[in-house]
Structure formats: C-alpha cells, structure tokens
C-alpha cells in the first residue's frame, strides 16, 4: 500500500465484495469451547458480517461478545463495531478471556497488530488464530491479504512477540487454529 488510507480502502472494498459470505468456522468455535470452557468477555477481529460473534454467543450465552470490522458496513451487524483491529483501545487492554480472528493476514502492520491483540488478553485469556494453509504461503499475499507465510514462520513470528502457542488444531476443512497465550503473563 502507498499509505494507510489505501489499506482501509482495499479492505473496505473486499468486505463489501464478500459481504454475502457466511462465517465458515462454526466447527472452530465448537472446538474453542472444548479447550476454553469459560469466558466472560470475547472479542473477534475482522468479522465482516458478525458470524463469529453469533457462534460465540451460542456457545457462551452469558458472555459479552463484540467484533470489529474496518468497513463502514460494521453498523449493519449486531455485536459489531467499526474499528481497525490493530489500533489499541484503552478500555480493551487486559479485558478479554477469548480473542479470535481469522483475519490476521489482513493486517496493515503485523507487529503492531499482534502486540495490540496480545495486550487485550485478560489474565488466563487465550488468543485463537486461524491460519489457512495455501492461502497463507510465503509469496501469496495481495492487496486484501497482505500478510502471508508458512505455519512454521507464523509461529516463529508469534514467539518473537512473546506469544506462546499452546495447541495447534488442523482437524478442520480449512487451515489451522492456534491457541495461544501471552507469554509475558505469569499465569
């Protein structure tokens, strides 16, 4: 991108083009529920039309669930706010038991983004990140998915940011889910 405005424009165009797509990861949320039984606050980043939030609300009915979407379409969907997921919000720091995203590959600044997300985890919180095999191979990035790399390189990236990968699950139709924790917390 030549600048941040172009990034937002490209992400918004992609969002509007894919707005009719349904969230494909219902089985992902079911698995998350088996490894993280309890959660009071859940945040989902890059949620397009809010399918993630609906699934989390189904499995954690008493939890506060919110999602972020950079596009101006965010206000059309319940439990969704328009927000660039890489931008820190003070009220979200150390606030969430679960952070979920299948959109990390959309990051404008991956280093800033992952630090923001790490800081949103409450004590004992878990970050669940989808990483999609072929779609994330080195050299596969494009204007709508600017971050790519092998799973091995992605895990190295997380470790460099003091994010500990606790579990990997690839028993899904598409990609992997990594369950992570803030490696700087003393839990």
Write out the residue ranges for each language-model feature.
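Core SAM-dependent methyltransferase catalytic element
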Residues: 161-187
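A short SAM/SAH-binding and catalytic strip from SAM-dependent methyltransferases
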Residues: 97-110
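Conserved Class I S-adenosyl-L-methionine
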Residues: 134, 138-167
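Class I SAM-dependent methyltransferase SAM/SAH-binding core
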Residues: 41-88
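A short glycine-rich, Lys/Arg-flanked "PGG" loop and its adjoining helix->strand segment in the class I
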Residues: 111-126
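Conserved beta-strand signature within the Rossmann-like core of class I S-adenosyl-L-methionine
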Residues: 123-135
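A short acidic, Gly/Pro-enriched loop at the edge of an enzyme's catalytic core
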Residues: 87-99
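Class I SAM-dependent methyltransferase Rossmann-like catalytic core
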Residues: 1-37
